[in-house]
A protein has these predicted regions:
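N-terminal export leaders
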Residues: 1-6
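N-terminal signal peptide c-region/cleavage motif recognized by signal peptidases
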Residues: 11-13
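Sterically constrained small-residue positions within well-ordered secondary structures
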Residues: 7-9, 138
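Interaction/scaffold regions that mediate signaling and macromolecular assembly across diverse proteins
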Residues: 15-239
Length: 239
């Protein structure tokens, strides 16, 4: 399904024409703090406090009541769906009372990415649908530095919402921050070891050469070859 067709399917009458993301922005400011888990520096989330905050219900309601088909520009679509993914990943953790890893919310035959995560415009969605059917087809590999699946090895959850007017700067900053982290982004000079994200989604970066160019652009230095990948730590990025 094309991106246009997918987004067109979200047009539902009588829904809000603009997303109210102020509750999500307040949640990110209140409940995301820098810390360390398993020796990895990252932004940690206080899931208990987030779930008890009345703004969480308000943020979920804003998604459910918003007609995503009204999003006009590429930047509006990209910012909205990154915010939606990150909020719904947190919702999965809270709803399923996950303590160890977000993957614990899934089952033997249905991984967590394919279970219902929440509602957008009155329609039930999964994290898999948002990532693979909406965000990845938009063609910007920096999404992989911005969407956060509630795990230690994920890029850091940004303590603010993504907004169309600042999206380029925000995504560049996310890429630079992630690649500056030697425990989960990249380590080495010349021959480098990378996040497993660059292995899983190599094609999104334009193949191996595109990965090397991306790393060189956002981290700098002489990047010649990928020597391997970090083990992915799926432990919850919790406070």
């Amino acid at each position: 399904m094309s991106l246009g067709a997918c987004l067109a399917g979200w047009a539902v009458p009588a829904l809000a024409a603009l997303p109210d993301l102020a509750p999500l922005d307040r949640l990110l400011h209140r409940h995301v703090r820098a810390g360390e888990i398993h020796g990895v520096a990252l932004n940690r989330v206080d899931y208990a406090a987030w779930g008890a905050d009345s703004d969480h219900a308000a943020a979920l309601a804003a998604l459910e009541n918003f007609d995503a088909g009204k999003l006009a520009s590429h930047q509006e679509q990209l910012a909205f769906w990154i915010n939606a993914y990150n909020l719904l990943a947190i919702q999965v953790v809270i709803e399923h009372r996950t303590q160890g890893s977000i993957r614990d919310a899934g089952g033997l035959f249905t991984p967590v990415w394919k279970i219902p995560a929440g509602r957008v415009g009155g329609r039930e969605v999964t994290l898999d649908q948002i990532e693979h059917r909406i965000l990845r087809p938009m063609g910007d590999p920096r999404i992989h530095m911005a969407i956060v699946c509630a795990s230690v090895s994920c890029p850091d959850l940004r303590p603010e919402i993504y907004v169309p007017e600042q999206l380029e700067q925000q995504l560049d900053d996310q890429a630079q921050t992630f690649l500056a982290n030697p425990k989960k982004g990249v380590v080495g000079d010349g021959n480098v070891r990378l996040s497993r994200i660059f292995d899983w989604f190599e094609d999104d970066f334009g193949g191996r050469a595109g990965v090397l160019a991306f790393v060189a652009r956002y981290r700098g230095g002489n990047v010649r070859r990928v020597d391997g990948y970090f083990d992915y730590d799926w432990a919850l990025n919790r406070q």
